[in-house]
Curated annotation (Swiss-Prot):
Highest classification ranks of the organism: Eukaryota, Fungi, Dikarya, Ascomycota, Saccharomycotina
Keyword line: DNA-binding, Metal-binding, Nucleus, Transcription, Transcription regulation, Zinc
PROSITE patterns: ZN2_CY6_FUNGAL_1, ZN2_CY6_FUNGAL_2
InterPro entries: Transcription_factor_dom_fun (IPR007219), Yeast_MetPath_Reg (IPR052202), Zn2-C6_fun-type_DNA-bd_sf (IPR036864), Zn2Cys6_DnaBD (IPR001138)
Gene knockout outcome: Causes a modest increase in azole resistance but does not exhibit altered susceptibility to cycloheximide or caffeine.
Gene name tied to this protein: STB5
Protein name: Negative regulator of pleiotropic drug resistance STB5
Length: 1005
């Protein structure tokens, strides 16, 4: 502020009576803050005014803000600061700024405006107008850069904008060089003119530098007369404005058309799924339609960036190889197709086919349970890679309804017994309304109320049933691979299911988990099991229902809750136990009853379900008390540890004996019913009592077969012999400290002098394993005489075996070396009449019993180095478990999934440990080792490392044969020792290299 101004201000202040009273201490100079806020007259008393004193509010005198100079006021106006009042000097400053800007506009040169505005206009410098014409209207601000109006003068005044007069008069400095640079760069290319927005759009928030031009033109439209010379140029600008509006409308229409085409294309792709999409390789790429690139134009300044024209459609819109394809490859493709300037990105970038299936939109995950679950499943689930269900021309093959019905029937006959979460009656009623495979997808279209869960359940149940029939050998090669295609179609409906996060989501997660058993790696099963169990706990399915909740639900709904939870429990527990990991829920946190049968027809299935639950509970209990970290921290004596083992052994024996007793009684009841039916029809069919007494069982069985279901026939096969005892004591042929290490080789006849003869003798029982079983199987016979051991076992098994024929009394000559035509026919007949479900088989029951015994006795955190007595029992259980496993394998009743593979590897690892500890009969174990090799080689078709493990055991078998030829000489025993330890190390290296994550406590040295 100048000198005279300062003097005048100071003089006015000195003569102010308020200042005099303030100096005398009578009152404050200015009002308090509260009175200012309430707009009341403040008495300004000290220390508090009467207004604040009455209101009992604090009184604060802030004083007066310091006065600003003209320069400070000018800077404030330029910065757009709202001034408290508009005095004369303020208006004077604003008028000076307007006048300077008008002079700048009138002195502009004769450059064509179309270099700046993209239009065809006379130069603005050709017109002159008085200052009075512009008093009520703001000037046009310049745009910095090479294409500005008289760049030098624009920079001298400053690039600023003035808001329309309907708002408060203020000036806003344009200080956004980034946007100015982008605008000037776009103008230099002459790709598109800068749009001039209509007045009704002018209230939007536009980027700086552009809104000044738009605001100025909108203001001139209201204040400039059409008769003035400058108005002639404005009319042309207005015409240009209208042209830009038309261009904008065209762009909006193109955007809408593009979105419409995208929606039609996606609907077309979904419709193609009803006819089974052909397989697509990973080399399929999305190719844009060739054509000239549309010039860039600022479209909608809401987002503050330049958007290009609508992107072209991608051709062809091929489906991916798998719904679980790796996201890394898809992300690389998205980076090529997607450009950040697109306001609406292309189809491939906005939502890839994989993301459409799993449900990840725009490559981002919202923070909710459904989205997180989708991303987790997408990252862990590998899924099917291709399908062979196509013709040579690539068109999908038709699927017969009868084949699909077989898949569904196989699921409910086998898998439903383990996981009864699907309401069988309701599901089959809905399924009966489907006439053909092509109408499955149309169900959701024609019936919007039909949930996507039903479509998912249909496809996934058929996929799981297909794996069951494939294992049983009841499908052709092409039909056997159809499960991958069905699972692919099921995952197309998985996105909407995860959003629900309810009991239907849990049911579908369990189905997906069952299917994941057949993946080469079990990581997805572990992930899905954890998600499923957490969702079950979140829904409160493990807690008992209150009386009010029970009253609001029907009996079917209550039972459905129980079954869904126990299905999730069985699924999670089998995964955790197979991997040697802790379970997600403790048995003490479960307060609901076991499933019960609602219909008479499902009593047998529910009995199997409850047996499975008991075995799952037992496996979890063994892990918790023997293999967990807390078990290893127990500071107890060896006697106390053995008591824990004995207690668990007794519980396991009780479960086994109770189930055997049920099956024995059920078998007798069925046998008597069949005999009565056959006896009643004997007179009509010509069968006499002499035929029955003479043992003409084949004729009776043939006549009775018409009235016996497949399930009963499968059960009768298992009940032909009573179960034999399992080993609990040390056999005399077991190598230990009190027995000569070379006595195990004494069973080899002295006449056997060649390696081929030794191999023939050792592998004789393997040749007829299905017809001439080994000693502890319920079905095995050699010359129609059961083979069994003399060791004591569970009471229920021991009582039923009056006849015993120890294996050591059978010479090698009693066993045929090769299969005859009769044995082949017998094996084929047995397989054709057997059921696809093995849970009613005694062989399966004994296999699971021995596997749990292995889990109990093997080296653990509780007992890292078991005594020799325990190792002897462990070795016998390993051999028995392997015989049962091989029996189911030969009968095609062994599921070839990663659960079975990991159990197999556990047995193999334990056998190696026992061999290194000399607790298994070498010659007796050779049979089981050869069986290990055969099964591991079969698993090698999908799991490559299983083939390498088979080679390790083959080398061990060859070494044992060489030692047998040498009659147990010491150098060869040393060679075997080195071979065993070397094989053990190689075995573990193979598992580690292939990331086989199984928690084992075995230490071979």
């Amino acid at each position: 502020m100048s000198g005279p101004d300062k003097g005048s201000d100071s003089g006015q202040t000195a003569n102010d009576p308020k200042q005099k009273k303030a100096r005398n201490g009578q009152m404050e100079t200015y009002s308090c803050a509260r009175c200012r806020k309430l707009k009341k007259k403040c008495p300004r008393q000290l220390p508090e005014c009467s207004n604040c004193l009455k209101a009992r509010e604090p009184c604060n005198y802030p004083g007066r803000a310091p006065r600003r100079t003209k320069k400070e006021l000018r800077d404030a106006i330029m910065k757009g600061e709202v001034l408290p009042s508009m005095r004369r000097k303020h208006r004077k400053i604003e008028k000076e700024l307007k006048t300077a800007d008008l002079r700048h506009l009138e002195s502009v040169d004769d450059r064509p405006v179309n270099q700046v505005m993209g239009g065809s206009m006379p130069p603005l410098g050709a017109y002159r107008g008085g200052e009075q014409q512009y008093n009520n209207g703001p000037p046009i601000s310049g745009i910095d850069g090479n294409d500005s109006i008289n760049r030098g003068k624009a920079q001298s005044v400053g690039s600023y904008q003035i808001l329309p007069p309907q708002r408060k008069s203020k000036l806003v400095l344009d200080q956004n060089p980034k946007f100015v640079h982008s605008q000037s760069s776009a103008l230099k290319t002459n790709e598109y003119p800068v749009p001039i927005m209509s007045p009704h759009i002018a209230n939007q928030v536009y980027p700086e530098g552009v809104s000044s031009l738009i605001s100025a033109l909108n203001t001139m439209n209201d204040n400039v007369s059409a008769n003035t010379p400058i108005a002639l140029s404005y009319l042309q600008l207005q015409k240009l404005h209208q042209e830009q509006q038309q261009i904008q409308q065209q762009q909006i229409q193109q955007q809408q058309q593009h979105q419409h085409l995208v929606q039609q294309h996606l609907q077309h792709v979904r419709a193609d799924a009803t006819s089974i999409l052909p397989p697509v390789t990973s080399q399929t790429v999305y190719t844009p339609i060739p054509g000239p690139r549309t010039s860039q134009i600022p479209f909608g300044f809401t987002h503050g960036y330049t958007a290009s024209a609508p992107p072209p459609l991608m051709q062809p819109y091929s489906m991916p190889t798998s719904p679980f394809e790796s996201r890394e490859k898809q992300q690389q493709f998205d980076n090529i197709q997607y450009h950040p300037v697109y306001k609406i990105p292309p189809i491939a970038a906005r939502q890839s086919p994989i993301d459409e299936i799993i449900g990840i939109e725009n490559g981002s995950i919202s923070i909710d349970a459904g989205s997180i679950t989708r991303e987790v499943v997408n990252s862990r689930m590998k899924g099917p890679h291709s399908t062979s269900w196509v013709n040579e021309d690539g068109s999908p093959k038709p699927i017969k309804k009868s084949l699909l019905e077989k898949f569904v029937s196989a699921y409910f006959e086998h898998n439903h017994r383990l996981f009864p979460m699907v309401d069988k009656v309701t599901f089959l009623k809905k399924l009966a309304t489907i006439n053909s495979f092509e109408s499955i997808e149309m169900l959701a279209v024609n019936n919007p109320e039909l949930p996507k869960t039903f479509i998912f359940e249909i496809y996934m149940i058929m996929a799981i049933g297909c794996t069951t029939l494939q294992r049983a050998g009841k499908l052709t090669t092409d039909e056997g691979h159809l499960y991958e295609h069905l699972a692919y179609l099921a995952m197309r409906n998985f996105r909407d299911i995860l959003h629900q996060q309810d009991i239907t989501t849990l049911r579908c997660l369990i189905l997906l988990g069952i299917y994941s058993f057949f993946e080469p790696k079990g990581v997805s099963s572990w992930t899905i099991s954890g998600i499923a169990m957490r969702l079950a706990i979140e829904l409160g399915l493990n807690r008992p229902l209150t009386a009010k909740e029970m009253g609001d639900m029907s009996a079917v709904e209550v039972e459905s809750r129980y079954r869904v939870f126990w299905s999730a429990y069985c699924f999670e527990r089998v995964v955790a136990t197979s991997l040697g990991r802790v379970s997600a829920i403790d048995d003490e946190d479960i307060g609901i009853p076991l499933p019960r049968a609602l219909y008479d027809s499902e009593k047998e299935d529910i009995e199997v379900t409850n047996l499975i639950i008991s075995l799952r509970k037992m496996g979890g209990k063994i892990y918790k008390e023997v293999h967990s970290l807390s078990a290893g921290r127990k500071d107890i004596t060896m006697e106390q540890k053995q008591l824990i083992i004995q207690k668990l052994r007794k519980e396991l024996d009780d479960i086994y004996e109770e189930e055997c007793e049920k099956r024995r009684l059920k078998g007798k009841s069925r046998s008597s019913k069949r005999f009565e039916k056959s006896k009643e029809s004997d007179s009509d069919r010509g069968v006499t009592e002499e035929d029955v007494k003479s043992g003409n069982e084949n004729l009776i069985g043939l006549l009775a077969s018409d009235d016996v279901s497949m399930t009963e026939h499968g059960q009768s096969i298992d009940n032909t012999l009573e179960s034999t005892p399992l080993p609990t004591t040390i056999p005399t042929t077991i190598v230990n400290d009190s027995v000569d290490q070379h006595s195990t080789l004494e069973n080899i006849p002295t006449s056997a002098t060649s390696k081929d003869q030794i191999e023939t003798i050792i592998t004789k029982p393997t040749a007829n394993i299905m017809n001439d079983q080994t000693d502890s199987d319920p079905l095995p016979k050699v010359d129609n005489k059961p083979i069994s051991n003399n060791e004591e076992g569970p009471k229920s098994l021991k009582e039923g075996n009056s006849e015993q024929n120890p294996s050591e009394n059978i010479s090698p000559e009693d066993v045929t070396l090769t299969k005859t035509d009769n044995s082949e026919n017998k094996e084929s007949s047995l397989r054709s009449n057997s059921n696809i479900s093995f849970h009613i088989s005694n062989v399966w029951l004994e296999m699971r019993y021995t596997q749990l015994q292995i889990l109990l006795y093997r080296p653990s955190a509780l007992i890292p180095k078991p005594p020799i007595e325990s190792l002897t029992v462990l070795g016998e259980f390993c051999l028995a478990a392997w015989r049962h496993t091989y029996t189911l394998y030969k009968e095609k009743l062994l599921p070839l999934n990663w659960i079975t593979l990991f159990r197999t590897l556990t047995i193999c690892n334990t056998i190696l440990y026992c061999l290194c500890q000399w607790s298994i009969d070498l010659v007796a174990s050779t049979i089981e080792i050869q069986q290990c090799v055969e099964i591991l080689q079969h698993f090698g078709e999908k799991w490559v490392f299983a083939m390498k493990c088979a080679d390790v055991f083959q080398n061990i078998s060859n070494t044992i044969v060489e030692i047998s030829l040498s009659q147990g000489q010491d150098p060869n025993i040393d060679k075997l020792t080195r071979e065993l330890f070397g094989a053990s190390n190689a075995y573990l290296e193979i598992l580690n290299e292939n990331n086989v994550d199984v928690s084992w406590e075995d230490r071979f040295r």
